[in-house]
Amino acid sequence: MSVMKPCLMTIAILMILAQKTPGGLFRSHNGKSREPWNPCELYQGMCRNACREYEIQYLTCPNDQKCCLKLSVKITSSKNVKEDYDSNSNLSVTNSSSYSHI
């Protein structure tokens, strides 16, 4: 029973602090107006209507925009893709380009 009191007290204090913390879970409040939390910013993405060719869509931003993240590798054009046909007329695609990590 004596172990239960400190445990309950710790849980109660943490619950009170979680409710009273300004700015939410990941953002501190510096006297600015409160903005809604944007999960796209956590992944260092940009909210846009359409992603650019070197970006991928990962999440959905507020106002039904797309969260566009930059790719870490550069994708080359499709000119480096070879098409080989076998005797059964099945198409097999081989990518001959090499990717380099930045």
Curated annotation (Swiss-Prot):
Does the keyword Disulfide bond feature in the UniProt annotation?
yes
A Gene Ontology term for the protein's cellular component: extracellular region
Short name of any one Pfam family annotated for the protein = Defensin_beta_2
Region entry Disordered, spans: 83-102
**Which residue stretches does the UniProt record annotate as biased composition, category Low complexity?**
87-102
Tell me where it resides.
Secreted
Write out the similarity annotation. Answer: Belongs to the beta-defensin family.
Q: Protein name, please?
A: Beta-defensin 116
Briefly state the protein's biological role: Has antibacterial activity.
Indicate whether Membrane appears among the record's keywords. Answer: no
Q: Which UniProt keywords apply?
A: Antibiotic, Antimicrobial, Defensin, Disulfide bond, Secreted, Signal
Domain of life of the source: Eukaryota
User: What S-S linkages are listed for this chain?
Assistant: 40-67, 47-61, 51-68
- Annotated signal sequence is 1-23
- Give the UniProt record's GO annotations in the biological process aspect: defense response to bacterium; innate immune response
Q: Which organism is it from?
A: Homo sapiens (Human)
